[in-house]
């Protein structure tokens, strides 16, 4: 494994992509279960959630699976919770939250993202909670994604009280060097070992 010499986003992105892809299927499945234990500790009971935006994991980059999170939210936290999924536009670098309908199918794009074909677009202001993909996060709740800024742009349009949750197989680093004013931090991040709470920072 290469040595990490700096903590800027570009180097972190390259390093943690390789590190995460080195995980075996068995390791990932085990950690998915452990992350779910921590996810359940997030104080979202009684919040009156109506709509969530949840990413569909990219298998070849070893993103944390979200199926159990969806099941937990819809069955134990808020029966009938609307779960929307991202649909990206690589020309405008914008992203919409799409609520699938009965006839909605999901296809893999040329960027290897699984996205809904059709469905109902949900206004950013109607979203109560967002599960964000990430490669690495730091002890202040900042995250490094894939570099296009899709989620930060969407979050900027959401209500200030939207709940921002990350899922990570790996623990945080001390600090991401090149955080900007456009980077929107997490409220919580669930890892296999613990739940990180950034709401009081």
Label every PLM stretch briefly.
Residues 67-71, 146-151:
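Charged helix-capping and loop-helix junction motifs
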């Amino acid at each position: 494994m290469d040595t990490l010499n700096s903590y800027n986003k570009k180097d972190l992105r390259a390093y943690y992509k390789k590190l995460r892809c080195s995980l075996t299927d068995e390791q990932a499945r085990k950690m998915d279960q452990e992350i779910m234990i921590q996810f359940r500790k997030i104080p979202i009971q009684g919040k009156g959630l109506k709509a969530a935006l949840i990413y569909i994991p990219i298998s070849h980059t070893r993103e944390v699976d979200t199926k159990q999170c969806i099941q937990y939210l819809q069955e134990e936290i808020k029966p009938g919770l609307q779960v929307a999924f991202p649909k990206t536009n690589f020309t405008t670098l914008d992203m919409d939250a799409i609520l699938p309908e009965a006839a909605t199918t999901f296809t893999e794009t040329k960027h290897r993202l699984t996205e809904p074909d059709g469905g109902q677009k949900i206004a950013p202001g109607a979203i109560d909670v967002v599960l964000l993909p990430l490669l690495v996060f730091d002890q202040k709740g900042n995250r490094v994604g894939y570099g296009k800024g899709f989620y930060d742009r969407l979050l900027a349009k959401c209500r200030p009280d939207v709940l921002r949750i990350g899922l990570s197989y790996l623990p945080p680093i001390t600090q991401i060097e090149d955080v900007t004013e456009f980077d929107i931090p997490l409220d919580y991040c669930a890892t296999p070992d613990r739940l990180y709470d950034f709401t009081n920072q």
